[in-house]
């Protein structure tokens, strides 16, 4: 699922230089950081929206055996249970709301993709463990804009503050009136920020 979260703009012929943007939720931020680390100077700018890192007690961390549990559920054919485990443990959705989610037609689509949820967990690695971010995982020298929504949960603001300390050319920009759903509800706001903001 994470591979859909990443897109690039070619800057020059033959895609020799890139501006990477994390355009969706979950592991897309990590994929963008990994790409920028691997491509080095070929990445000219990096844009991230609310990396969902859990680096303190602002939210319950994802269990250490999270990926193993997801795999066990999907291998047993318990696709709905796997999705429920994902939204509960990884997304932090309270139990009282999960029933409403199951009643939505999108739940069946999530069930069909439930075998990919473990990939997302593998990409996220230890970034949702409640511990500080690894200091040597990403070497990104490109100017980086980390966007957050004004009304988002504290964990997203804490994650942005932690990440900006690790990247030498990073800055945080808060989008007024937005929350974590802005990638769906206000994509034009994010797009304008990416276009207008100079790093």
Model segments located where?
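Short, well-ordered alpha-helices that flank and scaffold nucleotide-derived cofactor binding pockets
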Residues: 34-41, 165, 192, 196
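Active-site loop/oxyanion-hole signature of alpha/beta-hydrolase fold enzymes
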Residues: 1-23, 27, 192
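Alpha-helical elements of Rossmann-like donor-binding domains used by nucleotide-donor carbohydrate transfer enzymes
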Residues: 5-11, 69, 81, 85, ...
